[in-house]
């Protein structure tokens, strides 16, 4: 809205809205003024009669005809585009859109999108102009009347905003198939109608841009008159005097000193609050980082102090704390163990205590603690029972003692305070005892016929003619274990301890055999045999049974030969009968294989099957020899050979029954040696 003031009479000024569409002239008029009742000098008689006649004719015409036959207030040089043919207008539009534009890509949807975007931008600009013009005097013009006049004269719609540059909606990359379908649906009449509407909007946009330029020129005329007049249209120069439109700067209300002080205090308060919050956050983070750094230092120092080069560490995620941690491998898998019920892995978790480390075995689950490892730990115990022949019952004559590692163990002891090395040693002991019991039960499946039975999951019984051995898998908290420390020593305690130590050493021999087999598997074919590979109870049982068999042979020889044939003497010697596959020496350059073989050969006397030769020199009657051996550690086989005085062999037989041996010796002595 603007205010036009005439220089001749400021009191009786005429207020007009600079809208050229409201002021029209007949097409054939020669006058430059569209009004017949107002002039620049305020004298109505200065108008000629020709203009009055034209005005009367224009007032008598209908609105539609008057609108079509009228001339715009601003002489727009671009109005000639409306009279161009389609062949001339389309190249101009293509040139305005850009080099990549194709007129065939235009459709109704794209034009609607452009109009909607321009309408939104126009509304935003109008709001900004309204805010900028606060404080400036405006003319009292009826907005509703003007909007109705604009709508009736120029067909106003949402395209009334100023045209903007190409928004890029008509890009060549649009789908040509959709455009082709839209064009195929338009008829010639619809196309002409759309073209007419488009031209009207183009003309309206150019008129509005010209009007905006006129307004800016008139507003600039008080400051730079020469520059403003050069851009004014001839009609505006004649109708409105330059410098008649002005603008003023509205000053903001001054801020008082009190308000400034209040704002300064408020600003400082917010800054102090932000600084205090930042200080608290930094202090909290510093405390947390310092505590974490201290724990990490303590954790790694404990690992460096307690973990040796022989221990195997690996990365693992703790499922309970969901943090990365270190895992310790305390099992014997790398040493040749084939036990898979417990892989022997634990988590090294840091603590705030003195030792700084805590071992959590993975097999115990999330809720288990280190204390439950030792309280629920189990070990092997060997007990020896001697048979009382008069009563037909057994009496305890020997019991293995608890390992020195647990001598000071009690129910109230706190295992968390143990040294890490001690914890690792205990865990290794428990998993070793567990595997030993597992292997013993597997071996017992093949020794049922020799008096070896599994009474329950934690007890194995070995029965001999005069003795009985019990191998138990007990918990450290068992009452019998606690009370055993107070019992008096028994006769066979040392024997029970030696038997338990031998079982553990034989399990180590199995480990070494497995390692050696892995190393030589590429050059030597091996067929795994469960019955043959597990040698724990059989070597011990074979030694004890062989000893009983020797006593029986001595008794038979004494009754059948020594007491019958005079001047006879019994000689006895042991013969080594080694299994070549077990005690083979490999001619290899690998030092590890050679060392393993030497370690295995150190247990020859234990693993060797029993073989004893009995020789009786009967002088005048010849020589009698018996060889007692145990092919599979448990069975007995007796070879009898008799040579006469000329060293001719008369008999060479083998028997597996001692009754047959006794009968054969009685026959031999009574027939060949002492026929009388």
UniProtKB/Swiss-Prot annotation:
Signal peptide: none annotated. GO terms for molecular function: DNA-binding transcription factor binding; RNA polymerase II complex recruiting activity; RNA polymerase II core promoter sequence-specific DNA binding; transcription coregulator activity. One of its GO terms (cellular component) is mediator complex. Residues 29-40 have a biased composition (Low complexity). InterPro entries: Mediator_Med17. Residues 135-145 have a biased composition (Acidic residues). Keywords: Activator, Nucleus, Transcription, Transcription regulation. Residues 146-160 have a biased composition (Polar residues). It is found in: Nucleus. The keyword Zinc does not apply. Residues 47-56, 120-134 have a biased composition (Basic and acidic residues). Residues 27-68, 117-176 are annotated as: Disordered. Belongs to the Mediator complex subunit 17 family. Component of the Mediator complex. Component of the Mediator complex, a coactivator involved in the regulated transcription of nearly all RNA polymerase II-dependent genes. Mediator functions as a bridge to convey information from gene-specific regulatory proteins to the basal RNA polymerase II transcription machinery. Mediator is recruited to promoters by direct interactions with regulatory proteins and serves as a scaffold for the assembly of a functional preinitiation complex with RNA polymerase II and the general transcription factors. This is Mediator of RNA polymerase II transcription subunit 17. The lineage of its organism: Eukaryota, Fungi, Dikarya, Ascomycota, Saccharomycotina. The gene is SRB4.
């Amino acid at each position: 809205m603007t205010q036009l003031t005439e220089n001749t009479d400021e009191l009786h000024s005429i207020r007009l809205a600079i809208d050229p569409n409201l002021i029209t002239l007949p097409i054939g008029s020669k006058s430059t003024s569209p009004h017949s009742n107002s002039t620049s000098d305020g004298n109505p008689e200065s108008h000629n009669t020709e203009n009055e006649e034209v005005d009367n004719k224009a007032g008598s015409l209908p609105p539609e005809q008057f609108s079509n036959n009228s001339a715009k207030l601003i002489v727009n040089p671009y109005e000639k585009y409306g009279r161009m043919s389609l062949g001339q207008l389309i190249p101009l539009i293509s040139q305005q859109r850009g080099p990549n534009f194709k007129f065939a890509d235009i459709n109704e949807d794209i034009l609607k999108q452009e109009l909607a975007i321009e309408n939104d931008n126009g509304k935003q600009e109008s709001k900004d102009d309204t805010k900028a013009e606060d404080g400036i005097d405006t003319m009292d013009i009826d907005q509703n009347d003007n909007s109705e006049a604009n709508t009736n004269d120029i067909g106003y719609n949402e395209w009334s905003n100023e045209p903007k540059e190409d928004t890029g909606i008509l890009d060549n990359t649009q789908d040509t198939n959709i455009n082709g379908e839209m064009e195929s649906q338009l008829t010639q009449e619809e196309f002409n109608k759309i073209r007419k509407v488009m031209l009207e909007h183009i003309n309206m946009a150019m008129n509005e841009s010209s009007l905006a330029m006129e307004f800016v020129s008139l507003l600039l005329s008080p400051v730079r008159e020469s520059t403003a007049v050069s851009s004014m249209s001839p009609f505006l120069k004649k109708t409105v005097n330059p410098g008649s439109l002005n603008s003023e700067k509205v000053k903001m209300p001054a801020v008082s000193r009190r308000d400034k002080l209040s704002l300064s205090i408020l600003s400082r308060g917010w800054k102090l609050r932000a600084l205090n919050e930042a200080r608290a956050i930094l202090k909290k983070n510093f405390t947390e980082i310092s505590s974490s750094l201290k724990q990490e230092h303590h954790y790694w120092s404990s690992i460096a102090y307690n973990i040796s080069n022989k221990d195997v560490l690996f990365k693992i995620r703790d499922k309970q704390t969901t943090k990365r941690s270190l895992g310790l491998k305390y099992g014997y898998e790398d040493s040749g163990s084939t036990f898979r019920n417990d892989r022997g892995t634990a988590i090294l978790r840091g603590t705030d205590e003195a030792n700084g480390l805590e071992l959590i075995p993975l097999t115990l689950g999330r809720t288990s603690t280190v204390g439950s490892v030792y309280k629920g730990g189990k070990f092997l115990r060997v007990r020896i029972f001697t048979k009382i022949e008069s009563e037909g019952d057994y009496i305890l004559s020997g019991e293995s003692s608890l390992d020195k590692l647990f001598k000071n163990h009690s129910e109230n002891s706190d295992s968390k305070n143990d040294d890490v090395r001690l914890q690792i040693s205990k865990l290794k002991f428990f998993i070793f005892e567990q595997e030993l019991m597992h292997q013993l039960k597997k071996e017992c499946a093949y020794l049922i016929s020799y008096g070896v039975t599994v009474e329950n999951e934690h007890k194995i019984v070995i029965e001999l003619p005069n003795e009985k051995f019990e191998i138990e898998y007990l918990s450290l908290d068992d009452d019998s274990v606690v009370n055993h420390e107070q019992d008096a020593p028994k006769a066979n305690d040392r024997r029970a301890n030696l038997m338990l130590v031998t079982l553990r050493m034989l399990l180590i021999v199995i480990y070494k055999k497995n390692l050696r087999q892995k190393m030589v598997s590429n050059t030597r074919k091996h067929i795994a045999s469960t019955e043959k590979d597990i040698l724990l109870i059989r070597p011990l049982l074979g030694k004890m049974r062989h000893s009983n068999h020797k006593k029986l042979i001595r008794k038979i020889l004494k009754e059948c030969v020594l007491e019958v044939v005079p001047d006879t003497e019994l000689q006895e010697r042991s013969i080594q009968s080694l299994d070549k596959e077990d005690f083979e020496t490999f001619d290899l350059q690998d030092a590890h294989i050679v060392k393993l073989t030497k370690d295995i050969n150190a247990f020859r006397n234990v693993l060797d099957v029993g073989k004893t030769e009995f020789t009786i020199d009967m002088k005048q009657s010849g020589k009698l020899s018996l060889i007692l051996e145990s092919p599979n550690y448990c069975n007995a086989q007796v070879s009898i050979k008799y040579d006469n005085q000329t060293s001719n062999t008369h008999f060479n037989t083998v028997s597996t029954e001692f009754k047959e041996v006794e009968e054969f010796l009685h026959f031999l002595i009574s027939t060949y040696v002492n026929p009388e």
